[in-house]
């Protein structure tokens, strides 16, 4: 392992940290900074970074089919919590109907 490999792994770690900070800021800005949404966002971030790490390590080992498999499997897995987090964060609040004092027939 040379210095460039170490720098790549450090860059992936910093990218994971920055993405998680962005998810936190996004959810806080929407007013939906809850633990379940944070966990769901973390899972999306983890699988995305893991897919990138899998791709890089497979490329360095010259296993080109493993790159595609990692992107399909882990990248596809990252889409599920990412979509759930995005949809729940942008879900509008339910409107409460005001009850009237009169009875309509």
Curated annotation (Swiss-Prot):
May act as a membrane anchor for the tetrachloroethene reductive dehalogenase PceA. The chain crosses the membrane at residues 3-23, 35-55, 66-86. This is Probable tetrachloroethene reductive dehalogenase membrane anchor protein. Its main location: membrane. Belongs to the PceB family. One of its GO terms (cellular component) is plasma membrane. The keyword Disulfide bond does not apply. It is a multi-pass membrane protein. Keywords: Cell membrane, Membrane, Transmembrane, Transmembrane helix. It comes from the Bacteria. The gene is pceB. It comes from Dehalobacter restrictus (strain DSM 9455 / PER-K23). Disulfide bonds: none annotated. It is found in: Cell membrane.
